[in-house]
Amino acid sequence: MNVTDLPNAIFLMGPTASGKTDLAIALCQTLPCDIISVDSALIYRGMDIGTAKPTAQELALAPHKLIDIIDPALSYSAADFCRDALREMNDIVARGRIPLLVGGTMLYFKALLEGLSPLPSADPAIRAELEEEAARLGWQALHDELVRIDPVAGARIHPNDPQRLSRALEVYRISGKTLTELTQVQGEGLPYRVHQFAIAPSDRALLHKRIEQRFDKMLQSGFEQEVRALYERGDLTPHLPAIRCVGYRQMWDYLAGEVEYDEMRYRGIVATRQLAKRQMTWLRGWPEVTWLESGESGNLARVVARAGVA
């Protein structure tokens, strides 16, 4: 099929605090678009303030798919995202509208665009086995095992990253092949004509300032109470992906008495800036993307003109 015969989709990517949501809502008021969130933190229920989840007013203007879809105790993989996003995209197109995918989780965008490698599904029995070994021997011993069987993954994955470390070992124990071997097998690409845009301020100091202001606004809006409710549930730990989200891990440490309030605030801002830096690193190497300056009045018209879907 010729690429011009494929259905249209728009990607609006960018670091945290870059103005993606405002532009996305404006696009929905201009084009027949429906928003799909591409954010590994917005998927969790009960995590609204620290994730800067769209407000009720914003959601009334432009509903978002794939937010508030799972409990923080559960995990959600890039494969889960691809399955859910493609289902939503196909549904949107079937209604004669355009999927507008908005967010900053670049791994999700990449997986959706290029297709995922054929990795085996999680195996609870093997996960439990690895957890038991880690409790008995320590994560460093498991990391040493990974280095022996898959030096490339071992060099990339830190011993203090139990989620990724256990996944790499799990893949090997299930399939007999290393994570490095399997990820070299390309999946199926996205059957859409994708128009890709990245929005960010060109002045890094401005982005840093916006991040600091946003974090302080979260603190003023009840972020501590939000995380305390999660903390007091009793079934959540700092090792879960939800609690490892930027801001939540730092507030969790504060509630556990491990750091003072001012240190928590400082660490939360630094962690958010580091996240933005990683997002920008991804985007600078992203092919076929049109860059937009945060806050520029002509961004809406530029997206409409470039996408050519009006």
Swiss-Prot record:
Keyword tags: ATP-binding, Magnesium, Nucleotide-binding, Transferase, tRNA processing
GO molecular function, one term: tRNA dimethylallyltransferase activity
Entry binding sites for substrate: 16-21
Ligand binding (ATP): 14-21
One example of a Gene Ontology biological process annotation: tRNA modification
DNA repair as UniProt keyword: no
Site feature (Interaction with substrate tRNA) residues: 105, 127
A Pfam family assignment: IPPT
First-tier enzyme category under EC: transferase
Keyword Nucleotide-binding: yes
Cofactor names: Mg(2+)
Chain segments carrying region Interaction with substrate tRNA: 39-42, 163-167, 244-249
Family membership noted in the UniProt record: Belongs to the IPP transferase family.
Main function: Catalyzes the transfer of a dimethylallyl group onto the adenine at position 37 in tRNAs that read codons beginning with uridine, leading to the formation of N6-(dimethylallyl)adenosine (i(6)A).
Complex formation: Monomer.
Record-given protein name: tRNA dimethylallyltransferase
Gene expressing this chain: miaA
